[in-house]
């Protein structure tokens, strides 16, 4: 009770019993990205189904956890797929939506995809905000594709971020992020 910290777990697809154990141990949020739209999902994942993701999110809510779920843009999907992903997250009443922008990495199946433009990322952020007006729209991987660490994205609709390095790419400097967000009038 000394610190006001929300514990968020990210353990993949789990059972209702596991969700209950996580909640009982102090976890208040569960992270389960849907990755993309239902239509595009088979193109990016073959180990489980889109419905597996949806059922996990519904079960997390059922046991009283809030949910963090978003996806990755720039994996060959259409803008319509992005709209469908945003609508699905709104339908599921997801409280926190991380938006990752793909940075094509040599040696991966996505290495030859075009890099997203800043304008494309900003339009996507604005659309997610419009469809999910009360959710945290959380900038995640790919902020380095935008000028000024993605500052414009915070005026386009993002109101949260993940800072520091990501799984496969370098991220933004924490101190620089804090200074930028404070200068923009956000509380940290």
What positions do the PLM features span?
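Generic structural signal for well-ordered alpha-helices
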Residues: 19, 54-57, 86, 121-125, ...
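Alpha-helix N-cap and loop-to-helix initiation/capping positions
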Residues: 45-52, 77-84, 112-120
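Active-site beta-loop-alpha junctions enriched in small/polar residues
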Residues: 10-14, 35-37, 70-76, 100-104, ...
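Core AdoMet radical
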Residues: 1-57, 67-70, 95-98
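Surface-exposed amphipathic alpha-helices with a cationic face
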Residues: 1, 23, 57-62, 125-130, ...
